[in-house]
Design a protein with these regions (language model features):
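Short, glycine/small-residue-enriched coil/turn segments at secondary-structure junctions
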Residues: 48-51, 78-104
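Short, well-structured beta-strand-loop connectors
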Residues: 53-59, 89-96, 136-150, 184-194
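Short aromatic-glycine-enriched beta-strand elements
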Residues: 65-71, 75-78, 102-108, 116, ...
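Zn2+-dependent peptidoglycan hydrolase active-site motif and core
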Residues: 95-125
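Short histidine-centered loop motifs in beta-beta connectors
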Residues: 118-143, 176-185
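Conserved, short, structured surface segments that act as functional micro-motifs
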Residues: 146-181, 185-186, 192-196
């Protein structure tokens, strides 16, 4: 019949048949459209990675870091943390990629692919591991909230060091923060920000 023949049929054929066909097809079309919209919303939510507070303490802007390398975001974007008790926990599920020999910094690759560096203290590399205890090793799988390290805050500060903790996403070029972090006191395990993969990377 061809397309032109079909148009002719609908113009001259039984109008009731057209109505029946429309009634049969339209519900499927609406159902498909609704399912696609819900699927896209679900995928959008799934693509956001939740980063939780790795210490009991406070969060402030990374730009306030005493270490200018972190403050300038040369190593990536993130937040500046202050621990109340010197205990550091995993901010996400992932694998330990790096434990610095001096124990003052730990790198994690999350299960979603973000690479997070937690740096304990400013210039504390000079302590050569003194006052630090690390509870994980490279290639260990960790869960969010699992203890990673401890440091003796009192002793480190007595030596004249700042115990601030920059936490940065070192492959931030692949991500964007979904919503600005709230700068306040948190308990470990509370959500502090989300990461969303950039679509054009």
């Amino acid at each position: 019949m061809g397309i032109t023949g079909l148009f002719g049929f609908f113009q001259t054929g039984d109008v009731k048949l057209v109505g029946v066909l429309l009634m049969a097809v339209l519900p499927f079309g609406f159902t498909w459209l609704i399912e696609m919209l819900l699927y896209r919303q679900e995928k959008a939510v799934e693509s956001e990675e939740i980063i939780v507070m790795p210490v009991n303490g406070s969060v402030e802007q990374l730009e306030n870091a005493e270490d200018t390398v972190f403050a300038s975001k040369a190593l990536g974007d993130g937040v500046l943390l202050h621990s109340d008790d010197g205990k550091v926990y995993a901010p996400c599920d992932g694998i330990i990629q790096t434990v610095f020999p001096t124990k003052h910094a730990i790198g994690i690759e999350s299960t979603d692919g973000s690479e997070i560096l937690i740096h304990m203290g400013n210039n504390t590399v000079a302590l050569n591991g003194k006052y630090f205890t690390v509870h994980v090793k490279e290639k260990d799988e960790v869960k969010a909230g699992q203890i990673l390290a401890e440091f003796d805050k009192k002793e480190i500060e007595a030596q004249g060091y700042n115990c601030e903790i920059p936490m940065v996403v070192t492959n931030m070029e692949m991500y964007e923060m979904s919503g600005e972090p709230t700068y306040r006191n948190y308990k470990k395990g509370e959500e502090i920000f989300r990461l969303k993969k950039k679509t054009n990377v």
